[in-house]
Amino acid sequence: MAAEGRDSRIPVAILGATGAVGQRMVSLLAGHPQLRLAEVAASERSQGKTYFEATRWILPGDVPQDARGLVVKSVEEALGSRLVLSALDAKVADTVEPLQASRGRLVVSNTKSFRMQADVPLLIPEVNADHLALLDRQQWAAAGGGIVTNPNCVVVGLAMALAPLHRAFGIEAVCVTTLQALSGAGYPGVPSLDAQGNVIPFIDGEEEKIETEPGKILGMLENLSLIHI
């Protein structure tokens, strides 16, 4: 049993904590029973400020109390938390996520950068939890680090519906139509004139992700190699 007054929850760091996705992560960690927000990191203009000072909060309600006083660190800084959630833009994630993994950090990434890399799990726990075994193949394994990615938001729901059908009968083709919120293009999102009369005109790269990611998620793991469907 943990000593009285000691917080036994797992400490977590968030990369890109001041952006829209990072703010959502901060919000979800507020009062979490097993995870504790311990560190926040963001771009150079935010470094050295408290999270409250650095963030233009766009979610309903106030900045969570346990995040307000955290001092924003550099995304390249050595972090004390072994579990790192990444909400970075892809261009930054390309270098920062491997850097943190090489320091023994387990990076759980919301970014597209490493989703299709052969030894990186593209994870939906209810569908392909066994793919976590790929972590043992990663170049950062000896240091105790690694990268796990989550899929595109449309692909999550799609793959969860397709997985039991694929396992029972096999799938030859799927036709998909999506209607997506304006926030899917990021904050501040799509200009209002472009959005009139449409859910959202276009999100770059969305169709390609829906075409490629399910094949990896539904693939089979054999001898620590992933065979896509």
Task: Please annotate each region the language model reported.
Residues 227-229:
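Conserved small/polar residues in nucleotide/adenosyl-binding loops
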